């Protein structure tokens, strides 16, 4: 539980250590990140997107209707959509003001990658770029999306549950590809075990915040770091 609490406090304090005066708080309204060679955005606008050819141009258009078209393409055929694509969609959604959608697609991408990396042996050189890119997205985009997500703890829990259910309901087909070595003799069973662990972690979070003291302490920590002022609408 100590480790879990530490992770939550990191989410409360994320992105608060930039050089700012104590009196002036910068509102974080965009996810300005660079993850070569997949994605770059500055001041809320994409500089380039190279994650999934069917939607790259739509994401570059930088408007809500185009983003929704991109999401529809993913929803219609999600089986081989890479986690980096889902987290890029999350970044675009955040920049365009669809922040709850951003939370969902970020967690969906994060959990899809976790499921992949838990079943497939990603320690080899062939996965170096994949691991680095996903780690970068989870860290850089997460430093913005997580603090926003916890503006409403109850809503965050609902979205996390939906994201886990989405990953369970849409197994990433790459997990079952013979091209990729697995640490498990039964990949379906291994994937099921990963999903069960994600659900168990989700339940631990619910139990943690069901304790009024834990919730109050967490809210106080966010207030200390002025996280709500930076991230909440």
Annotate each language-model stretch with its function:
Residues 2-10:
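Sec-dependent signal peptide recognition
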Residues 99-115:
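TPR/TPR-like (Sel1-like) alpha-helical repeat modules
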Residues 55, 89-91:
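Conserved small-residue packing positions in alpha-helical repeats and bundles
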Residues 119-130:
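Acidic, Ser/Thr-rich low-complexity linear motifs
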Residues 59, 94-95:
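Hydrophobic/aromatic side-chain positions at a characteristic register within alpha-helices
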Residues 21-80, 112, 130-233:
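N-terminal alpha-helical interaction modules that lie
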Residues 10-19:
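Hydrophobic h-region of N-terminal signal peptides that target proteins for export
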């Amino acid at each position: 539980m100590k480790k879990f609490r530490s992770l939550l406090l990191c989410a409360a304090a994320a992105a608060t250590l930039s050089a700012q005066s104590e009196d002036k708080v910068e509102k974080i309204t965009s996810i300005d990140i660079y993850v070569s060679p997949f994605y770059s955005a500055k001041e809320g606008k994409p500089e380039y997107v190279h994650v999934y050819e069917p939607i790259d141009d739509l994401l570059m258009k930088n408007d809500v209707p185009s983003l929704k078209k991109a999401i529809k393409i993913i929803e219609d055929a999600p089986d081989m959509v890479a986690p980096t694509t889902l987290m890029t969609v999350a970044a675009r959604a955040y920049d365009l003001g669809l922040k709850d959608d951003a939370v969902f697609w970020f967690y969906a991408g994060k959990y899809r990658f976790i499921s992949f990396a838990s079943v497939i042996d990603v320690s080899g050189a062939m996965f170096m770029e994949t691991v680095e890119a996903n780690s970068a997205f989870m860290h850089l985009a997460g430093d913005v999306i997580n603090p926003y997500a916890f503006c409403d703890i109850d809503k965050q829990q609902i979205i996390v549950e939906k994201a886990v259910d989405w990953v369970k309901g849409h197994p990433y087909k790459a997990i079952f590809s013979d091209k990729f070595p697995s640490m498990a003799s039964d990949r379906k069973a291994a994937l099921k075990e990963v999903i069960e662990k994600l659900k168990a972690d989700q339940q631990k979070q619910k139990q943690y915040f069901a304790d009024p003291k834990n919730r109050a302490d967490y809210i106080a920590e966010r207030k200390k770091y002025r996280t709500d002022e930076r991230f909440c609408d």
